[in-house]
Design a protein with these regions (language model features):
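Active-site metal-binding core of divalent-cation-utilizing nuclease and nuclease-like domains
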Residues: 142-146, 441-468
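Structural motif
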Residues: 151, 469-473, 507
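Mg2+/Mn2+-dependent nuclease catalytic core
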Residues: 171-177, 477-496
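Feature representing long, continuous alpha-helical segments
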Residues: 432, 436-440, 470, 488
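Phosphate-binding site recognition
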Residues: 1-430, 445-447
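Metal-dependent nuclease catalytic cores in nucleic-acid-processing enzymes
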Residues: 180-187, 341-349, 439-444, 489-509
């Protein structure tokens, strides 16, 4: 492909308007056959949960264009083989991510949104009319003036509820929801199709308590790929971009796709159709920049974690292979469903397997794993984020360069006094505390870490892999022999032997730790040949 042809290919970075994508000549992964089936399956009320930045808004906007009968935008897409009538319906679209986190902000957004529809359809409004009455009048007037039932699209319905959760504002926001969205059931005869997207499920609001016939398609196999990009779709639509990214980084196209898969793929949304799904936001940005970066996390994806997950820094290993009842995952309220449910709905965990009514959950990919570990390091080390970032950046560089003397200084600074001072670890023995802290720090750097690897000769405390080196760490407390005992064990058990075939240099480290929890005392490179 020539440079000119490549420049003509436009990736839709940050664009959530279907019309802009189609008229602007941006690349579009065609989901319109799935969207058509959703719109015409005979279910009036539909709900879809997907993580943030996962393509829900462009899905909603595509539905709007379809129901508004904008046939010209769909030329060349799969829906053209399916839709024959292209009926134009009146459409209400509400983007609740604009609704703020207080009742005042929520009222203001709905007031403004309803005003625009009142102006468009010339709805008579009494000054004292409530938001619920105005919503009802809009739906009825649409029907009266067009002769067509209304289509109602509510995007990111839970955003104000998430952001107000655990604040004094939450109950007032919930009351507004109950009042306004109870209208959906009252106006059933005037509605053609209602589609609601969100991340987390708050069942105490009327969307779920009143709409008892609300169809949750979040776990339905036919809609598993309605958001996101499958590996096949990536190969079908983005080969030139994959090749260009590979050329810039010295990878073959196959290696590039493998890297993208490790970083951004791995989502599954049902037990029957375990197709790997890329996070579309991260994939598109990576192809645009031709870099592997943490796009999803840097967009604010981790900001709500402290509200919904307590003591997460102590539970990371558990979350990477945890179990949850099918009924809990599919139907429970996020408020009462536990940390696993929130982490799944928010995209931090995904379905890894299913057995006898129980889902197995784990981290979907490298980007999410690294992002979560970076979030918990300040809490675990009891240091400010700025302190952690500075020390971690230096530690990463030194570990990647094989400079163990300088790496030791950075690690000392990060874990000084932590095992002693962090009372959440009181039930753990001292060596276990050090293993948790050190493995979390290394994982937050994006290194591959394995704890307590079993060999025929013994058990390696920790293995840390970086691009050019493999570090084999044996940890010993000062009152248990310290560096001398750790060095002897590495040699006697031949701990570096399993890695001799690897092209990377293997560095064995005998690590001495203070038995009272004051931190790293010293470490020493071990030469097994001596």
């Amino acid at each position: 492909m020539t440079d000119t042809e490549m420049n003509d290919r436009r990736l839709p970075v940050g664009i959530q308007s279907f019309e802009v994508i189609r008229k602007g000549g941006y690349l579009y992964v065609d989901k319109t056959d799935i969207i058509w089936r959703l719109a015409n399956r005979g279910k009036k009320y539909n709900y879809l949960s997907r993580p943030r930045r996962f393509g829900k808004s462009i899905l909603v906007d595509t539905l709007r264009a379809y129901f508004e009968g904008k046939k010209e935008l769909f030329e060349g897409l799969k829906v053209m083989e399916l839709e024959k009538e292209w009926t134009c319906y009146p459409v209400i679209r509400l983007d609740m991510s604009c609704g703020g986190a207080t009742p005042e902000e929520l009222n203001s957004y709905l007031d403004d949104a309803f005003y625009k529809y009142e102006q468009k359809y010339e709805v008579a409004v009494r000054p004292e009319a409530s938001l619920a009455v105005r919503f009802q009048n809009i739906i009825e007037t649409m029907f009266q003036k067009t002769g067509k039932q209304a289509v109602i699209l509510i995007d990111e319905y839970d955003s104000p509820l998430q952001h107000s959760w655990k604040t004094p504002q939450h109950d007032a926001c919930t009351a507004i929801y109950k009042s306004v969205f109870a209208v959906l059931k009252k106006e059933d005869e005037h509605e053609r199709f209602v589609f609601i997207t969100g991340i987390t499920k708050f069942t105490q609001i009327s969307l779920f308590s009143v709409l008892n016939n609300l169809s949750n398609i979040s776990f339905d196999a036919p809609y598993a790929t309605i958001c996101g990009i499958s590996k096949q779709e990536a190969a079908d639509n983005f080969i030139p971009e994959i090749e260009a990214m590979g050329e810039e980084n010295g990878w073959t196209p196959e290696e590039t796709l493998k890297q993208l898969t490790a970083f951004y793929d791995g989502y599954h949304f049902c037990s029957d159709n375990m197709v790997d799904i890329f996070n579309p936001f991260s994939l598109i940005n990576a192809l645009e920049d031709r870099k592997l970066r943490n796009y999803w996390a840097s967009s604010g994806a981790t900001s709500l974690l402290p509200k919904f997950v307590d003591d997460m820094e102590m539970k990371m290993e558990y979350f990477d292979h945890c179990f949850i009842e099918g009924d809990t995952l599919e139907t429970s309220d996020v408020v009462n469903g536990g940390a696993e449910l929130f982490l799944y709905q928010s995209g931090y965990l995904t379905i890894k397997g299913y057995d006898d009514g129980v889902y197995i959950l784990g981290f979907p990919n490298f980007e999410v794993r690294k992002a979560l570990y970076r979030v918990v390091v300040p809490a675990l080390t009891m240091k400010s984020n700025s302190e952690v970032v500075s020390a971690q950046s230096f530690l990463r560089k030194m570990m990647q360069d094989g400079n163990t003397a300088e790496a030791k200084k950075a690690l000392k600074a990060l874990i000084a006094d932590v095992p002693y001072s962090n009372k959440k670890m009181a039930s753990m023995d001292m060596e276990e505390r050090y293993r948790l802290i050190m493995s979390t720090i290394f994982r937050a750097l994006g290194f591959r870490v394995e704890v307590e690897r079993m060999l025929a000769t013994g058990r390696i405390d920790m293995i840390v892999e970086v691009p050019s080196f493999i570090y084999v760490l044996e940890l010993k407390l000062s009152n248990n022999g310290g560096i001398s005992a750790a060095e002897s064990q590495i040699k006697e058990k031949s701990y570096t032997e399993p890695f001799k075939a690897d092209k990377r240099k293997v560095i064995a480290l005998a690590v001495e730790l203070d038995e009272t929890g004051k931190g790293l005392i010293d470490w020493k490179e071990v030469d097994e040949s001596l």
